Amino acid sequence: MGLEDKPDLVAGLITTRDASERPADEGEGLLAHVAEVTVIIENRGDAIAGETTTRFWITGGDIDQELRVIQTPPLLPGAEVEVTALWNMRGLDGQYDIIVTADAFSQLEEMRKDNNAAVAHVVVRGTRVELV
């Protein structure tokens, strides 16, 4: 298998959405202190990327822990998928880094591995989370 016929998963832009930003119909069942953390995973390679694992990690304050691990579906070359984790921010005022890693457990042989992670710096104030 040559370099040109491998998948290449990329963790792209990380976004957050707290209760104040959720339309009422989408927030049904979600508590006010729960935020959504979403990343776009894209296959920039030239081969199909099989099912993999995307890991969300939170660090800052007294926290350095896995938030969630999500099975990510197979992706054709050029395809992308949004992957979302829920974050319980109750009592977590302060600054945090959210690190999201595509193919977190190196399940695929990829063109590159240095583009699998993305980081977002956020500030939590009560039930609000803001990118900084």
Can you describe what each PLM-predicted range is?
Residues 1-132:
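Extracellular/luminal regions of secreted and cell-surface proteins that mediate adhesion/ECM remodeling
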